[in-house]
Amino acid sequence: MYNRLFNRCPRYYHACPIAPDIVFHLASIVSGEAESNFDAGWQVNMFTMWHYLEALKALHIGSNGAYVPKIIFTSSIAVFGGPFPEQIDDTFLSVPQTSYGAQKASCELLLSDFSRKGFVDGISLRLPTICVRPGKANLAASSFFSGIIREPLNGQKAILPVDESVRHWHASPRAAAGFLRHAATLDSGLLENRRALNLPGVSCTVAEQIEALRRAAGQSVIKLIERQPDDTIIN
């Protein structure tokens, strides 16, 4: 699928094997990896979006305009950069401070423009950091937010690379699934051409996370969290 659609070859714009009514676009190289591997980050996170939208545009044109799929794109709060106000709303300026954030912001603009032209009907959801994520840790810079909960609960050590005063914005996997389902049924005409939306979440500090874990599982679990500052993540 990747080779057929995303190798920058124009003849593959017509190679989309199916014509879905709704597309949930979740795929990406995660933040830490996108920062360390610049070329791969842009190729996977931005150029694949462009080529997939081109493939859907070809289906739209081939249907004489009848085919207009709904695209739900999982963007990120990484599109924002400081300094931050007390509250961030949908009108806050997008000034990403990472390659990952820049790639997500680029995809938001691509999706908005393809939607403006009527090729697709897209909405970008700026998801909070999903916590607690299941499975193993990945290369996302925010992975530790889940790790300091998930690993200790499984009797494993977890690395905390930032100060406990760090505040972040979280949503659960269940909440994220609900956001996606709701967006799929949303009348985009209500958005007045503002197709990138901030989503609700829980704002808390790392210290508050750890205290919640302590109340739920006890002090012995907290001892499995090791403080190891990491300038790459801190900055």
Predicted regions and their residues:
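Glycine-rich NAD(P)-binding loop of the Rossmann-fold in SDR/ketoreductase-type enzymes
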Residues: 22, 36, 40-51, 94, ...
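NAD(P)H-binding glycine-rich loop region in Rossmannoid oxidoreductase-like domains
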Residues: 6-44
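NAD(P)-dependent short-chain dehydrogenase/reductase
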Residues: 112-167, 173, 177
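Conserved Rossmann-fold NAD(P)-dependent oxidoreductase catalytic core, especially the SDR/UDP-sugar
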Residues: 50-97
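Active-site Tyr-X1-5-Lys
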Residues: 82-84, 95-123
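SDR active-site strand-loop-helix element
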Residues: 23-29, 71-77, 125-128
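Hydrophobic positions on the long internal alpha-helix
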Residues: 48, 52-56, 110-111, 179
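C-terminal substrate-binding subdomain of Rossmann-fold SDR/epimerase-dehydratase oxidoreductases
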Residues: 161-163, 169-235
